[in-house]
Amino acid sequence: MGMVKRFDVYMCENHAKIRPCVVLSPDEMNEVLPYVLVAPITANERPFPTRVGIRIKGKQGQIALDLMRPAAQVLLKEKIGTIPNATCLEISDILKRLFAI
């Protein structure tokens, strides 16, 4: 697998299932650590302030920033896309508020 980049979308092994997720950790960390920070993309839409709407591979879903977690890079399988710039800014804004930074 090539370099894992922030805001790329991968299919990721998760408890015997493979689900889409967004990489949130910075590229500098992704280069040297064996794991990345990811947020799952879920089809179950909820009106939470930590959720961001996304359309990926023709399907509507939400990036669940409230469910972010570390994942070993070896669990990342197929890269299926990259998040659009406007959505990246929205994610960054929510993370700043979430962590009060």
Go through the PLM ranges and name each one.
Residues M1-I101:
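Conserved functional hotspots at enzyme active or ligand-binding sites that engage polyanionic ligands
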